């Protein structure tokens, strides 16, 4: 692979990754915000601490049922108006892998097995990672400043 092909591949990777982030940021934020709003309601009903309740609900994210995962995935496709989300995820995985392969194998032609997650699985993984980060810093969602 010559240096121009690599540069083009790097540009494509950056663009696909930027597009994917742009598509996911607001819908994922809205999803986490809805978890916080549910925590507020639950905390009022049970007289528990809102942030502890928020953390409790966030900790359930990795264990979401397939129906919940698919519902969130479909919601994200609708609100982001991105019916090509699965293709975008695939493009990001392929571009990243091609760059890593070009660096690792130099001029050798070697077949690489690439497991690309489904769109729903990828979105659930993003939710899980975001939930972990917000669990560590729940004050980011407080409304009482």
Please provide the spans of the model-predicted regions.
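Extended alpha-helical interaction segments
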Residues: 1-114
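Alpha-helical bundle/repeat cores within regulatory domains of eukaryotic proteins
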Residues: 108-145
């Amino acid at each position: 692979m010559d240096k121009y092909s690599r540069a083009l591949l790097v540009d494509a990777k950056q663009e696909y990754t930027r597009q994917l982030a742009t598509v996911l940021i607001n819908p994922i934020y809205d999803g986490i915000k809805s978890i916080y709003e549910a925590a507020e309601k639950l905390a009022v009903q049970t007289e528990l601490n809102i942030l502890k309740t928020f953390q409790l609900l966030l900790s359930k994210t990795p264990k979401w049922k397939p129906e919940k995962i698919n519902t969130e995935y479909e919601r994200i496709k609708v609100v982001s108006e991105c019916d090509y989300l699965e293709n975008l995820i695939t493009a990001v995985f392929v571009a990243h892998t091609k760059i890593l392969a070009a660096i690792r194998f130099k001029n050798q032609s070697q077949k690489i097995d690439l497991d690309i997650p489904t769109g729903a699985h990828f979105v659930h993984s993003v939710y899980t990672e975001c939930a972990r980060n917000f669990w560590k810093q729940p004050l980011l969602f407080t409304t009482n400043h």
